[in-house]
Amino acid sequence: IIHSHNYLMSFFLLKKTDIFTVHDGLYYQSGAVNHKLQNLFKYIEKKVYKKSGLVHFISKFAKEKSLYRGDNFKIIYNTTPFEKIDLKYSSKVNWETDKIKIFTVRSIEERANIDLLIELAKRKRNYDIKVAGKGPLLEKYREEIRKNQLENIELLGYIPDEEVRKFYETADLVTVLAKYGEGFGLPIIEGYLYNKPVFASDICAIPEIIIDKNFLVKNNAEDLESKIEKYYEELPVYNFKKYYEENFSYDRILEKYRQMYDKFFKI
């Protein structure tokens, strides 16, 4: 079986792609940034679907924003390998112990809305914000943090999985912010795996994945701050880990993949 996640690879592949997985529609993504080759990407996306035996989407949102109009598709959410991989922690993570500890994992690019976290750090000095991930805007944002003399937010850059897991375990909450192009929101379920509240932007596939609409935020620092403060004032009872296990656990998602492959073999 040829199972591809890459539009260009499948487009240039001489053989037919048996199963093609869509994270974000190519045409939708290019439109979000007004790419000059948007019409070419539209052609490529449609061509790839025609060459694919079965199309798999990681969310309903990904399906809605795609150019796929056929009936031979499956929607299966993501899971996280952190559930099954037993890693040893080689180092400690440094938090300000008297502050609310906020962790996020993002690619440091325009759509990740790092500006919002920097603004939050300016407003709330009692928050300790750690951002893991690399990307083209990493140094730009680090310089902005230095210029504003913000000691309560740190861009960690790339860190190994064992450190990512340790940050998840020791954080008080997780944020997942986005301006566009969020076909699923993997850090949301990673936060739930470690039984953490996750506050995330009210866009794209995120409302599908979030445990409750009370954790959805508008893309401004005021609303994010308000939602976090309200949570700590009321301390509502949620079992985030159970929500993960019932909807995104490795075994549940693996079974759905098995069913998808069974469907393919029956075509």
Model-derived regions, located:
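Short His-centered aromatic/hydrophobic patch
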Residues: S4-M9
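Membrane-proximal helix-turn-helix segments that form the acceptor-binding/catalytic region
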Residues: K36-V55, Y68
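Conserved donor-binding/catalytic core segment of Leloir-type glycosyltransferases
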Residues: H56, N94-A112, I118-K122, I129-K130
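Nucleotide-activated donor-binding/catalytic signature segment of Leloir-type glycosyltransferases, i.e.
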Residues: R142-I159
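Short alpha-helical donor nucleotide-sugar binding micro-motif in glycosyltransferases
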Residues: Y158-I159, K166-A171, Y257
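Short hydrophobic beta-strand element within catalytic cores of glycosyltransferases
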Residues: I188, P197-A200
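Conserved acidic donor-binding segment of nucleotide-sugar-dependent glycosyltransferases
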Residues: D212-E222, E229-E234
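A charged, aromatic-enriched C-terminal amphipathic alpha-helix characteristic of glycosyltransferases
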Residues: E233-K266
